[in-house]
């Protein structure tokens, strides 16, 4: 992955140096197990442990001749060890070390990835608590629907990220696999006990039945889980992009001193981070598709998967890590315009409460069809400057079924806030500690009564 979208901490894990370190870690764990079972001399293991080292430049040099990177790696390490080097890679095939080393890399990468999840969830939790009662327009089909709160909206994303994290955790658990069963998975060159011992050393589980490789359904699940990270990131990114449109203006990404939005238009403040994350999410999903293509290999293995995985595993982990961190920064610096949210609610002149008026009329004895017809008529007859509440009071037919006291209860939004408080308390925040502070009235006449 290009450095622009790489956090150094994650990039280091997927560097060539780190990859070969993981290969060497596997090779030494195998030699240790073989020495324990007296398959190789104890002195050979001690020599390997003391002298094994590699040079990426030397490996690249050898590979120009061998056209095989694992052989080049083994040759380089062996030449540094001396006579005992002949016991390096003893009884192994290349995929034994490659697949097991990839498992080791993924476990290391997961530590960084989950630290980013922790940070993102913490920031989201703070925003949910802060804006639990910040009323905003809920939209369906891009149109005003009913009142919600900004905190409630974000709480849905928080829970989605928690589910996504769970998917990643389960996928990583499925990738904690050691495979040392040889060229076609039959343990022809060393016993299964070696695999078990190495698994204990590395914290991995033996594959039940392998071919030359670990079955690629595991890898596909891993990349699918990272693709779901992209999907969760994109859903929130798209929401933030819509809310930042000039006509909406409910949130604004942080704009730092000296930052510029356009080479031609000095006034521009664009949602560049949310747009960037939308694009990166496409790559994560695309890589998941490529991983699915790798599942069906020929017989006991071909190498059609290899070139793909050299790209998609580093790229997907690096991108997911970067995307989570960038989203955390977006939310950390996000300006939430509560006044604009209130004004946007007022654009609908109180119609966001029409469903509650409908139910109030039904409770007074009207059929649903009759009540719907009355409320729809009053809504569609609203003129500029009107509010649904005032027109219902003035309408002879509607006022027979809902009076001022009924409407006052509806148009404060208190019912939504109480129920939202209950839901957030159970799912997100833990037990509620009193009511959140109210927000002041917006300028001019508001379609929402009282404080919110």
Residue ranges and their predicted role:
Residues 164, 212-305, 310:
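Glycine-rich anion/phosphate-binding loop at the beta-strand->alpha-helix junction
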Residues 195-212, 216:
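Active-site-adjacent "gating/activation" loops or surface patches in catalytic cores
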Residues 1-181, 186-187, 191-197, 206, ...:
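A helix-coil-helix interface module used to build multimeric assemblies
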Residues 30-33, 113, 117-120, 124-127, ...:
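Amphipathic alpha-helices that form helix-helix packing interfaces
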């Amino acid at each position: 992955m290009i450095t622009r979208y790489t956090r150094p901490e994650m990039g280091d894990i997927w560097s060539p140096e780190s990859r070969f370190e993981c290969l060497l870690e596997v090779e030494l764990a195998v030699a240790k197990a073989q020495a324990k079972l007296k398959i190789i001399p104890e002195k050979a293991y001690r020599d390997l442990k003391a002298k094994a080292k590699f040079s990426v430049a030397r490996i690249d040099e050898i590979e120009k001749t061998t056209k095989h990177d694992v052989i080049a790696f083994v040759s380089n390490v062996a030449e540094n060890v001396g006579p005992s080097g002949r016991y390096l890679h003893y009884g192994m095939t290349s995929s034994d070390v490659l697949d097991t080393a990839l498992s080791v890399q993924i476990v290391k990468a997961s530590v960084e990835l989950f630290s980013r999840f922790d940070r993102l969830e913490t920031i989201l939790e703070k925003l949910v608590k802060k804006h639990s009662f910040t009323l905003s327009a809920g939209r369906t089909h891009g149109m005003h629907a009913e009142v919600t709160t900004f905190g409630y909206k974000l709480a849905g994303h928080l829970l989605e990220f928690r589910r996504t994290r769970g998917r990643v955790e389960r996928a990583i658990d499925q990738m904690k696999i050691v495979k040392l069963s040889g060229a076609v998975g039959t343990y022809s060159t060393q016993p299964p006990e070696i695999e078990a011992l190495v698994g204990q050393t590395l914290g991995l589980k033996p594959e039940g039945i392998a071919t030359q490789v670990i079955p690629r359904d595991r890898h596909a699940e891993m990349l699918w889980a990272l693709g779901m990270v992209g999907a969760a990131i994109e859903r929130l990114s798209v929401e933030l992009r819509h809310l930042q449109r000039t006509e909406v203006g409910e949130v604004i990404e942080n704009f730092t001193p000296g930052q510029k939005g356009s080479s031609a238009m000095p006034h521009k403040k664009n949602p560049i981070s949310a747009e960037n994350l939308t694009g990166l999410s496409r790559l994560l999903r695309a890589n998941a598709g490529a991983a699915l293509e790798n599942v069906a290999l020929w017989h006991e293995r071909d190498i059609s998967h290899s070139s793909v995985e050299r790209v998609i595993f580093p790229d997907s982990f690096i991108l997911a890590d970067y995307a989570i961190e960038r989203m955390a920064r977006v939310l950390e610096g996000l300006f939430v315009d509560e006044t604009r949210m209130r004004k946007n609610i007022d654009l609908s002149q109180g119609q966001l409460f029409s469903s509650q008026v409908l139910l109030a009329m039904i409770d007074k004895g009207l059929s649903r069809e009759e009540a719907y017809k009355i409320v729809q008529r009053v809504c569609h007859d609203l003129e500029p400057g009107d509010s649904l509440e005032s027109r219902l009071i003035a309408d002879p037919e509607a006022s027979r079924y809902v009076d001022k006291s009924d409407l006052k209860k509806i148009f404060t939004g208190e019912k939504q806030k109480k129920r939202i408080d209950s839901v957030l308390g159970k799912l997100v925040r833990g037990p509620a500690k009193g009511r959140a502070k109210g927000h002041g009235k917006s300028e001019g006449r508001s379609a929402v009564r009282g404080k919110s």
